[in-house]
């Protein structure tokens, strides 16, 4: 029996470390409880960085369980979110005092409306529209309504992403006004793998493309301000309008 235990220990220590450990697991696994995080060391990390990587990957899965669960109810998580590199990057990089709404569906005048990304920092609300298609794509602003996407020698007309971004801003402004929330709103058009060609500047909008993304993320993650009461109130006001699809746990 002692020999079997030693063999098992050796097998565990031989497990290779891959940076995509959590990327291959597309589903949120069931546990006895989803409200308690218990890291599981399944191999022996060789460096401190490997240990950190193992911890944050497992914690990412716990975050997805936690955000989709309550004591009485649970929601299914679309596997695409487990593979979403931007979501993973935001949850693992941004400070804990940021509150993130990732493509939430809100009930506005009894109609469901899907928004893009909303980040509530202690000092402002970021409305982010994601513009990611082919690698190295160039998005050119031609008019208020239409843009052009260029990939190599190919061109394609598309609807201006600013329409969706401005729409999201108006909805959040309305929610804040109805709840007496005083929090500045800043709009961001984001592409991590392409480029944005916008002539001049536009008030209240930041254009973050492949060239500026690392600097932008670095700026966000160095926030030192503690959570603010108005920030929490703003998050609660948005949560009150969010559409939830869930089912009751068997124990209830």
Give the location of each predicted region:
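Long, charge-dense
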Residues: 138-162
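Phosphate-centric recognition/catalysis
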Residues: 116
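Surface-exposed interaction regions that form or flank ligand-binding interfaces
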Residues: 1-112, 156-159, 163-252
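Active-site beta-strand-loop-beta-strand hairpin of nuclease catalytic cores
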Residues: 119-145
